Amino acid sequence: XXFENFLNANXAYVNLD
């Protein structure tokens, strides 16, 4: 993906295209 975002609610790291 190109967009990177942090999910503070779950403290997880995800990559969004």
Swiss-Prot record:
MF annotations from Gene Ontology: carbonate dehydratase activity
Reactions accelerated catalytically: hydrogencarbonate + H(+) = CO2 + H2O
Species of the source: Streptococcus thermophilus
Enzyme class: lyase
Keyword Lyase: yes
Domain of life: Bacteria
Assigned protein family: Belongs to the beta-class carbonic anhydrase family.
EC number assigned by the record: 4.2.1.1
Record key words, sorted: Lyase
Protein name per its UniProtKB record: Putative carbonic anhydrase
